[in-house]
């Protein structure tokens, strides 16, 4: 049930879903992981592409990607030796789209 202004929040629903929200918010609390999620919004990118766009070492990027994989926020697809990443769920996409509207489009 979505929260409507003036409507009481359903405490049981909130408790049930808050753990999933915390996982996503913790991942986004790190600037590099947030940047990775933003880059994956409408793109499937390889580790090499992410590394060059972020100007981040392969080992540092691997640690961030491992965090995102562990928490189920990204999907992977392997093609030969190349691993490609995409966002894993509509919730992740919706949150990144919201942040983009609030912080990126507002500045244009």
From Swiss-Prot:
Query: Which Pfam family name is an example for this entry?
Result: HTH_5
Record's signal peptide: none
Write down the PROSITE patterns for this protein, in alphabetical order: HTH_ARSR_2
Instruction: Tell me which UniProt keywords the record has, alphabetically.
Output: Activator, DNA-binding, Transcription, Transcription regulation, Virulence
Query: Biological process GO annotation list?
Result: regulation of DNA-templated transcription
Q: Which residues bind DNA?
A: 47-66
Segments forming a coiled coil = none
Q: In terms of domain of life, where is this protein from? A: Bacteria
Name a GO molecular-function annotation: DNA-binding transcription factor activity
- What residues does the HTH arsR-type domain cover? 13-107
Kindly give the SMART domains that the UniProt entry links to this protein: HTH_ARSR
ATP-binding: present as a keyword of the record?
no
Q: Which PANTHER family match?
A: HTH-TYPE TRANSCRIPTIONAL REGULATOR YGAV-RELATED, TRANSCRIPTIONAL REGULATOR, ARSR FAMILY
- Summary of the function given for this chain in its UniProt record: Up-regulates the expression of the hemolysin gene, hlyA, and may promote expression of other virulence determinants in vivo. It may have both positive and negative regulator activities.
Q: What is this protein called?
A: Transcriptional activator HlyU
Gene (name only) = hlyU
